[in-house]
């Protein structure tokens, strides 16, 4: 908002969000597959998904998710010992702090799914990759983030009573696998007019 008003800045960020989401997913898939076409396709699906399209109607904090694939990329590189401990801890800490500032919901979801993925791979790939080192370094990063975010946690705890009881309807902002094939209300051309 230094150069433009809030509305213009918001619109620019809404235009950048899908492209940055797609690019981050492209980097992750390109690293995993070494196939540019597959990475392009996956980046497109991630960056311009119905989830992003529906949240661009008013939830920029939920539509801006490029840090999620970047956190996963950093974790995979650490598990494969392609990045040092200090670099991993510092990078993951910065990414988590940024994601906390953007959206705590996305961070909590990423942490939960990351833990499920970790335990899945721990039992299937623990001999081929450094799962214990990844867990230790992630724990150190989590402690660092907790210390740095302790003032925010304090005020979140104080404001817990002010959370409204009602939950928004999932009709508009819901996500399902059919959304890629059958357009939802938010992705259908013309929206509610048709």
Model-flagged regions — what are they?
Residues 15, 19-32, 37-123, 137-151:
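Membrane-embedded helix bundles of polyisoprenyl
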Residues 65, 119-121, 133, 165, ...:
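Residue-level signature of transmembrane alpha-helix interfaces in integral membrane proteins
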Residues 81-82, 122-130, 149, 153, ...:
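Transmembrane helix-loop junctions in multipass membrane proteins, especially transporters and channels
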Residues 1-13:
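Juxtamembrane segments of multi-pass membrane glycosylation machinery
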Residues 6, 38-41, 72, 116, ...:
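Alpha-helix initiation and N-capping motif
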Residues 4, 48, 86-90, 126-131, ...:
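Juxtamembrane loop-helix boundary motifs flanking transmembrane segments in multi-pass membrane proteins
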Residues 6-9, 18-19, 132, 136, ...:
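Generic detection of long, well-ordered alpha-helical segments
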Residues 135, 142, 150-194:
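Periplasmic/ER-lumenal interhelical loops and adjacent helix-loop junctions
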């Amino acid at each position: 908002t230094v150069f433009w008003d809030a509305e213009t800045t918001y619109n620019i960020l809404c235009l950048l969000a899908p492209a940055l989401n797609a690019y981050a997913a492209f980097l992750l898939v390109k690293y995993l597959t070494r196939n540019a076409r597959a990475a392009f396709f996956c980046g497109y699906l991630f960056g311009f998904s119905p989830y992003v399209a529906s949240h661009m109607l008013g939830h920029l904090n939920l539509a801006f998710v490029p840090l999620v694939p970047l956190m996963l990329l950093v974790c995979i590189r650490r598990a494969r010992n392609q990045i040092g401990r200090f670099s991993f801890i510092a990078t993951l800490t910065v990414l988590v702090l940024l994601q906390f500032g953007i959206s705590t919901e996305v961070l909590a979801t990423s942490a939960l799914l990351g833990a499920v993925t970790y335990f899945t791979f721990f039992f299937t790939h623990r001999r081929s990759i450094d799962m214990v080192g990844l867990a230790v370094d992630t724990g150190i990063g989590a402690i660092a983030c907790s210390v740095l975010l302790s003032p925010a946690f304090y005020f979140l705890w104080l404001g817990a009573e002010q959370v409204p009881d009602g939950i928004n309807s999932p009709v508009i902002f819901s996500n399902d696998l059919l959304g890629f094939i059958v357009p939802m209300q938010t992705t259908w051309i013309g929206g509610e007019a048709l």
